[in-house]
Amino acid sequence: MTTMLSIVQVKNNEIPKTLSIKKFKLIAGVDESGCGSLVGSVIAAAVILHSIQPISGLADSKTLNKNKRLNLYKNIIKNALAWSIGYADVTEIDRSNILEARLLAMKRAVHNLSVKPDLILIDGNRSPGFTEIPYQCFNKGDARIAIISAASIIAKVTRDQDMIILDKQYPKYGFAQNKGYPTFFHLKQLALYGPISQHRKSFAPVKHVISDINRKL
């Protein structure tokens, strides 16, 4: 199998007994990218891999260099049985919070799959609450379970590409390099030029800049 675990002990009630991965044929891994960014959507990916065509080298996307990650991304989208993306945009993030937006993006990613999985493995300790499909959450699942690693790679590469496009529209903030995360340069430019429409106004660094601007009016 493509998963790194063959047996998973379930602690919650989603699946009442010890979860034997082998009895499920269509296993989807789900992960997200962009929770800590100050800019843009949070993006989730859902991936179903062929059990007889394992992809070697899968790992947490954050631990891979750019070239390795991109090569794996191409391999996954070429050879996966199914894969999809789900977005939660800036308005949805600011309206609720990043944790709820993360779950919403995950739910959309699974919904967008062209093939319905019979098991979902999710990175983290919270689930959107799938009612028709058994699921299980795993802390650091992107580093422990290959199918979740695959989802983490799809989500990160997709979001990085979106940030490169945004950088071309707003080159002052360095989005192509920092991907919207609060680097020194990004925060400096944010304070100097103010936020754009894609900045998450509910996030403290952006909220602080907006407050400073309003005080000066």
Curated annotation (Swiss-Prot):
Keywords of this entry: Cytoplasm, Endonuclease, Hydrolase, Manganese, Metal-binding, Nuclease
Domain RNase H type-2, first and last residues per copy: 25-215
GO MF annotation list: manganese ion binding; RNA binding; RNA-DNA hybrid ribonuclease activity
Gene Ontology cellular-component annotations: cytoplasm; ribonuclease H2 complex
Cell compartments where the protein resides: Cytoplasm
Entries under InterPro entries matching the protein: RNase_HII, RNase_HII/HIII, RNase_HII/HIII_dom, RNaseH-like_sf, RNaseH_sf
Note on how the cofactor is bound: Manganese or magnesium. Binds 1 divalent metal ion per monomer in the absence of substrate. May bind a second metal ion after substrate binding.
Family: Belongs to the RNase HII family.
Entry protein name: Ribonuclease HII
Organism: Blochmanniella pennsylvanica (strain BPEN)
